[in-house]
Amino acid sequence: MKKIGVLALQGAVDEHIQMIKSAGALPSKVKHPSDLNELDGLVLPGGESTTMRKIMKRYDLIEPVRAFAKEGKAIFGTCAGLVLLSKEIEGGEESLGLIDTTAVRNGFGRQKESFEAELNVEIFSDAPFEAVFIRAPYLIEPSPEVSVLATFEDKIVAAKEANILVTAFHPELTNDNRFMRFFIEKMV
């Protein structure tokens, strides 16, 4: 059984753990660099990206997560995870630089502008995906290596490059585990 870690510093950790279980893998909480050992994949959940980056620095997780990706292991980032994984963050904040695109933090507005929307997702032909956007970012300026998987209002909200998958929305806050299944079955 594949073992998938969830960066457990803040955000929807428990929801991701349930989603990983529903997709047939074994979840594990990651709080320290040694927790990355023996993992097949890693999830960076939503939350507040600046706070997450500061906590990652405090626990010396920045370079170990980069090394995890450079080993070819898969990482799935949702919302703040998307922001952290992007090569650049509009406004110049530090990122992990693991997917060649730029993130626009809170691109769809603040908390009161949170919403749900049906998305047609490139990798799911069976039915639209009901996405939950909370202070959601979006992506701009993807390199040719980045596959755009979904857009909303002409803004990139899901993408993939090599072993990195990102969504601007929160699949873990729905009952639809297709993104997690795709991550575990096709990328890990």
Curated annotation (Swiss-Prot):
GO terms for molecular function: glutaminase activity; pyridoxal 5'-phosphate synthase (glutamine hydrolysing) activity. Pathway: Cofactor biosynthesis; pyridoxal 5'-phosphate biosynthesis. Pfam families: SNO. PROSITE patterns: PDXT_SNO_1, PDXT_SNO_2. Its EC number is 4.3.3.6, 3.5.1.2. One of its GO terms (cellular component) is cytosol. It comes from the Bacteria. Keywords: Glutamine amidotransferase, Hydrolase, Lyase, Pyridoxal phosphate. Catalyzes the hydrolysis of glutamine to glutamate and ammonia as part of the biosynthesis of pyridoxal 5'-phosphate. The resulting ammonia molecule is channeled to the active site of PdxS. In the presence of PdxS, forms a dodecamer of heterodimers. Only shows activity in the heterodimer. This is Pyridoxal 5'-phosphate synthase subunit PdxT. It comes from Listeria welshimeri serovar 6b (strain ATCC 35897 / DSM 20650 / CCUG 15529 / CIP 8149 / NCTC 11857 / SLCC 5334 / V8). The lineage of its organism: Bacteria, Bacillati, Bacillota, Bacilli, Bacillales.
